[in-house]
Amino acid sequence: MLIIETPPTLRQTVKQWSQEHKRIALIPTMGNLHEGHMALIDAGRARADKVVVSVFVNPMQFDRPEDLAAYPRTLQEDCEQLTRRGVDMVFAPATGVIYPDDLASQTFVDVPRFANILEGESRPGHFRGVATIVSKLFNLVQPDVACFGEKDFQQLAFIRQLVRDMSYDIEIIGVPTVRAADGLALSSRNGYLSAEERRLAPQLNQVLMRLVAQLREGERHIDGLLTSATEQLLQAGLRPDTLVIRDAQTLQPLTVDSRRAVVLFTAWLGKARLIDNAQVDLIS
């Protein structure tokens, strides 16, 4: 497995692959890898000849410097996992390689349709950071395919819009959420949970599934459903952040024309911000 840290070496390698008519899959990550990331890699491998995993803790995606400093850096362990998984290349650049100048003077990429709603309201500037680093990676790697998890549903919609708007010739694959046996969605941030918090964390998915079941049964009193879910989470010891039911295509409030809904939940448990979602076909 190649471990590359600089754009010139990366470009040289992917150019050679392209000349050999190899399809390339890109899996962007911030490291601290788990089985959810492995599912992305497997999805990429099923669709391409070469798999590139980027490992870069993007400072533009963090609201607070202390959160950036606390994010786990586990590159050696990550590379060991990726070698076992048969990844062809890890691109692990230093921050100064990706952002050689001060961030205040950095050129940014923005996707206003999805950047300033829901998660974007809670985390100002976060999606601008995502769009900027993903655009850089797309330009450097020139992938045929890129894989993203459905756990971060808004991010997936956001990336698809970015690809449309910027005319990238890249197939975006959404990979289903990987869960622990008790239903908790796998996340690098689950490592922030204490043993007791980890015991409580599956309540997020359990409350979500109860709400989804009601939607599938035809319940459409959205405010009532969300109020009940909020109360259940509070009783379970979680602090609800974002609980919404939206059109799965537009992420706007449901209308009479909505065919599919997505239920988006985020809640705090200790220092961890948990994220989960589920899609529902609406009964006409």
UniProtKB/Swiss-Prot annotation:
Pathway, per record: Cofactor biosynthesis; (R)-pantothenate biosynthesis; (R)-pantothenate from (R)-pantoate and beta-alanine: step 1/1
Catalysis performed (reactions): (R)-pantoate + beta-alanine + ATP = (R)-pantothenate + AMP + diphosphate + H(+)
Molecular function terms from GO: ATP binding; pantoate-beta-alanine ligase activity
Active-site residue numbers: 37 (proton donor)
A Gene Ontology biological process term: pantothenate biosynthetic process
Enzyme class, UniProt record, top EC level: ligase
Binding positions for beta-alanine per the UniProt entry: 61
Broad class of the protein's primary localization: cytoplasm
Keywords: ATP-binding, Cytoplasm, Ligase, Nucleotide-binding, Pantothenate biosynthesis
Annotated positions binding (R)-pantoate: 61, 155
SUPFAM superfamilies per the UniProt record, alphabetical: Nucleotidylyl transferase
InterPro entries: Cyt_trans-like, Pantoate_ligase, Pantoate_ligase_C, Rossmann-like_a/b/a_fold
Location of this chain's protein in the cell: Cytoplasm
Residues where ATP binds: 30-37, 149-152, 178, 186-189
Listed Pfam families: Pantoate_ligase
Superkingdom, taxonomy of origin: Bacteria
EC numbers, comma separated: 6.3.2.1
Summary of subunit composition and partner proteins: Homodimer.
Function field: Catalyzes the condensation of pantoate with beta-alanine in an ATP-dependent reaction via a pantoyl-adenylate intermediate.
Note: The reaction proceeds by a bi uni uni bi ping pong mechanism.
Family: Belongs to the pantothenate synthetase family.
Name assigned to this protein: Pantothenate synthetase
Species per Swiss-Prot/TrEMBL record: Sodalis glossinidius (strain morsitans)
Lineage: Bacteria, Pseudomonadati, Pseudomonadota, Gammaproteobacteria, Enterobacterales
Gene behind this protein: panC
